[in-house]
Amino acid sequence: MDLYNLRNNMRSRYFSMLEYLNNGFEIFKMFVKKHPLLVFSHFVFSTVMVLFITFPFTEQAVKMYEFAQKVSNTKMQKNININEYASLLSSLFSMLLLYALISLILQFVAVIIRKKAGLEIEMEEDAEKEKIKKDKFKLGKITLKFIIMMAVYLIIGLALIMLIVVFSLVLDSSSALFIVSVIYFTLFFNVLYLQQIYYLRDVNLVEAFRYNLYLSKGKRLRILLPIIMIALITFFINYALNYFTGITIGKLQNLQILGIVTSATGGIVKTFSVLYTIIAENLVYFNVEYMDLKGLK
């Protein structure tokens, strides 16, 4: 793919959604060839996550549900073992922590992919520019940014949970969830360019948020439509793969093999979806920023 012409085109006009998707897919193929280990690591952790949800996590959740049913049954309350409850609760909590850890690793790999993909798009292919790429890709700095971002996400998540609790005290639960959902989506629609700016530019989180609000004016649909389209493509691919896998391996009547194969296909689809979405988001961001800078000249 000719990235030089791509950059020139992004500086001269706004792309259509189809152009974002087509160019994004070409860069996706190029990125997979240049960074196979990075892509493979995302696939491995994605597969592990699906496997984790399919087997141990689901098993513990079912046991916890069965115990809750036992507690609700008045005839069986005398036979309740407190140690059994503590053991189940401890196991479930450990599973949640492990799930959170795998999720964090996946998000960190996605951040590295975003940074490397952004550098691939923006930088020229010669020895001097390759040196600039290495200088701009500083793992320590990216890690620090990631930790700050995750801390902010955690604070926002806890704040939303607290709001649900507070609103539930004065309103019914459905109304409380509706209000918090409105707050969540309001936040979501106002951070559409945040990650691209934060990880691709040398700015802090506050500066990135302000610039994100500036670029978002009239440009929210420009980034939302490609994301929605990729999500739909991913859904149909995932559905087709699961259907084919279910028919093929279901004949063996072996749930373990079915779970493993489904997890592997799920890992492939998730990696494709994340990588394709990240590249499309980067393209939209660069295009919007270049055109904004062009308008200021």
Question: Where in the sequence are the language-model features?
Answer:
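Interfacial aromatic "cap" segments that immediately flank transmembrane helices
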Residues: 13-48, 130-157, 187-237
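Polar/charged alpha-helical tracts
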Residues: 5-8, 19-22, 26-30, 51, ...
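N-terminal entry module detector
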Residues: 13-95
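A generic signature of intrinsically disordered, low-complexity regions enriched in glycine/proline
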Residues: 46, 50, 54, 208, ...
